[in-house]
Amino acid sequence: MFKKKKYTVIRQAISKDLASFVANYFMMQKQVYDTCRNARYFSPFENILGYYESKDDQIPNTYCAYSDIAMETLLLKCQPEMEKVTGLKLYPAYTYARIYKKGDELKRHKDRFSCEISTTMNLVHIHYL
């Protein structure tokens, strides 16, 4: 299917337990970042625990992290399955994780060349009231 349509859907690519673990980890990391930022433990320009990108054209003012170690580990775990499904030898480039807020919408877009083959994974879905 991938070669024909240039995409495929892999259901349950990781276990529910692993998805929950990684999602909880990332939400806790956001809480730590928010606490440290609000208490001024570090500069608002520090991004080691993630950041809120105000100039993001896609989803502004939403917590995100570039190349987080847990997400990089998840990328490597999923690589063999992605190679099997695509029939390609893949070379991991980077990860980018984001916690969407109510009203956030990621519109169809083109990323940089290193994202020629990408994976999008929804770890948890929270219904907003």
Question: What does each model-identified segment do?
Answer:
Residues 83, 87-88, 124-128:
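Short helix-capping and hinge/turn segments at secondary-structure transitions, especially at repeat
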Residues 99:
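Conserved active-site beta-strand element of glycosyltransferases/polysaccharide synthases
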Residues 102-129:
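Catalytic core of non-heme Fe(II) oxygenases with the double-stranded beta-helix
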Residues 9, 96, 118-122:
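Conserved hydrophobic/aromatic beta-strand scaffold that supports enzyme active sites
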Residues 87-96:
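A short coil-to-beta-strand element that immediately follows conserved catalytic motifs
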Residues 1-86:
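Non-heme Fe(II)/2-oxoglutarate
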